């Protein structure tokens, strides 16, 4: 599927601010399941933009605006192709085994997904043993999260801990992803957080689909399939209906924007995403 994406992020400040510095991780990510064709980032007011690749392979832009401003807008425009039509099928060529050094970040506790006894207890209560390390085992874990947790807006924030989510069994896609990551790691499966977009419902007539935010899911590594995505929010294995933007240990590694400024001002954030199918 070929997709065009427009992501608008706008910060409004209650007073002039200066020396705004912001990391932007709005990709898109390029790998064997997704080919990046075009990407452009625009910043208002005009500032410097420097591109680099972070330690997880994410395309990252460092935006700096030195002059006084009361508004900062970042607009990214992307065109890409997603190619994984049958995500449940094992690849024709066996995946490259992960070296221990490649696994450590995605098996160890991370800032937003600590090692909680709740994860092991949930695995035991569901009857999971070693088979959770298989593709089918991870698929079942993803469905377990989907079935046991309620999708509910405005009950959590980006600061809500995974321990709180485990207690209340409700949240949004970020929370579902953190719970599934914790379960996978407790079962010995390398798992990482993915930020991106869902585009499976795009109309074929080039009409835009507008969303208010990005989406989140999990990629887990199994010996038969390599890295594959599992969307516990929607109870699906991730294929060409998802666009990957960034990966990391948890949300803290892939936050779309993160930065600072100098000045005594409150800020208000607004995000609009538009996606178009162009094939």
How should each PLM-predicted stretch be described?
Residues 27-29, 44, 77-79, 221, ...:
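Structured loops at beta-to-helix junctions and adjacent beta-edge loops in soluble globular domains
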Residues 1, 7, 20-22, 39, ...:
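Structural beta-strand/beta-sheet cores of well-ordered domains, especially the beta-sheet scaffolds
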Residues 143, 175-265:
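Hydrophobic/aromatic-rich core segments of domains that either
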Residues 13, 48, 94-95, 103, ...:
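Glycine-rich, flexible loop/turn motifs
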Residues 1-125, 131:
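Linear, non-domain "peripheral" regions
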Residues 80, 89-91, 98-171, 179-181, ...:
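Secondary-structure boundary elements
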Residues 9, 156, 233:
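Ser/Thr-centric signal marking residues that sit
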Residues 47-53, 65-67, 81-84, 114-123, ...:
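Noncatalytic linker/hinge segments flanking ATPase motor cores
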């Amino acid at each position: 599927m070929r997709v065009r994406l427009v992501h608008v992020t706008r910060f409004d400040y209650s007073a002039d601010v200066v020396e705004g510095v912001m990391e932007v991780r709005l990709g898109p990510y390029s790998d064997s399941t997704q080919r990046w064709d075009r990407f452009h980032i625009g910043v208002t007011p005009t500032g410097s933009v420097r591109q680099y690749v972070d330690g997880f392979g994410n395309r990252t832009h460092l935006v700096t605006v030195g002059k006084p401003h009361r508004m900062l807008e970042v607009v990214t425009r992307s065109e890409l192709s997603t190619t994984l039509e049958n995500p449940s099928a094992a690849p024709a060529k066996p995946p490259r085994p992960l070296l221990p050094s490649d696994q450590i970040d995605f098996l160890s506790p991370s800032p937003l997904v600590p090692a909680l006894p709740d994860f092991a207890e949930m695995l035991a209560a569901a009857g999971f043993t070693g088979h959770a390390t298989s593709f089918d085992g991870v698929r079942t874990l993803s469905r377990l999260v989907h079935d046991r947790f309620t999708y509910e807006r405005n009950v959590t924030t980006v600061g809500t801990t995974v321990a709180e989510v485990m207690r209340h069994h409700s949240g949004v896609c970020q929370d579902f992803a953190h719970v599934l990551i914790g379960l996978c790691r407790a079962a010995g499966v390398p798992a990482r957080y993915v930020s991106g977009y869902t585009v499976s419902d795009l109309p074929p007539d080039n009409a835009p689909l507008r969303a208010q935010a990005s989406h989140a899911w999990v990629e887990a590594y199994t010996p038969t399939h390599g890295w594959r995505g599992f969307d516990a929010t929607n109870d699906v294995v991730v294929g060409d209906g998802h666009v990957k933007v960034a990966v990391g240990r948890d949300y803290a590694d892939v936050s779309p924007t993160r930065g600072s400024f100098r000045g005594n001002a409150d800020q208000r954030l607004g995000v609009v995403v538009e996606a178009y199918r162009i094939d």
